[in-house]
């Protein structure tokens, strides 16, 4: 029914991702469709049932094989286009913020690249967990989108000083968690602005360059990076 194009898909076809499928393969890590057949011994799924899948490959074909354990049954009311773009970004943000970041209600989260897929999911998950969210994006339009989906404050790093704006928005304390799917030139000023015993979550490097972060900050601020 539908397949999404995620940043890992671009890396996979360039052989730059940690998962390197054997050639030849059909790209498309995440998709939604209807079960056409079941393997021997498969339980919990039925032929004709709608599912969303995240098997890593196959989504850009007319048919795909997927392990049953990686198929999520869908209600008929869930649009295929939404379902095909749901699992990866929300699972990524939930794992980063809740499992690795140990986010607690009342903490402040800074989301870099906040208007993208994982960024918008991070805003929603952090708000659902009771956090205050600062969304950083590259335009006023993107910042407005972030506010519409729940961000408490925004930072436009195309014309605002990252460290100064973060300091102003946190009364000089800094964010407890920084969620970074972007990397690049704004990673270091954000990293240097983190709160005492904060957590820096490295989710990806969508900007291209992998930043070299000052490790001394981890000792002086007792912060954790993941």
Regions found by a protein language model. Give the residues of each.
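Conserved beta-strand positions in the Rossmann-like core of class I SAM-dependent methyltransferases
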Residues: 36, 134, 201
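N-terminal Rossmann-like NAD(P) cofactor-binding module of classical short-chain dehydrogenase/reductase
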Residues: 52, 110, 155, 178-179
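Glycine-rich phosphate-binding loop and adjacent beta-alpha segment
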Residues: 137, 146, 182-221, 225
């Amino acid at each position: 029914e539908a397949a999404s194009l995620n940043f890992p898909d671009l890396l996979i076809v360039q052989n730059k991702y940690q998962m390197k499928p054997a050639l030849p393969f059909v790209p498309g890590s995440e998709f939604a469709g209807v079960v056409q057949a079941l393997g021997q011994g498969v339980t919990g799924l039925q032929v004709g049932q709608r599912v969303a899948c995240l098997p890593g490959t196959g989504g850009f074909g007319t048919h795909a094989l997927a392990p049953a354990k990686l198929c999520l049954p869908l209600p008929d009311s869930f649009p295929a286009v939404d379902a095909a773009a749901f699992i990866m970004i929300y699972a990524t943000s939930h794992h980063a913020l809740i499992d690795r970041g140990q986010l607690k209600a009342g903490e402040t989260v800074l989301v870099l690249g906040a208007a993208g897929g994982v960024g918008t999911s991070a805003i929603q998950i952090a708000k659902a967990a009771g956090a205050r969210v600062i969304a950083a994006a590259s335009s006023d339009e993107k910042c407005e989108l972030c506010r519409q989906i729940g961000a408490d404050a925004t930072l436009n790093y195309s014309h605002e000083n990252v460290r100064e704006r973060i300091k102003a928005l946190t009364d000089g304390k800094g964010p407890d968690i920084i969620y970074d799917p972007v990397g690049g030139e704004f990673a270091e000023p954000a990293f240097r602005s983190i709160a005492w015993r904060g957590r820096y979550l490295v989710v990806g490097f969508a900007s291209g360059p992998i930043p070299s972060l000052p490790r001394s900050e981890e000792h002086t601020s007792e912060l954790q990076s993941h």
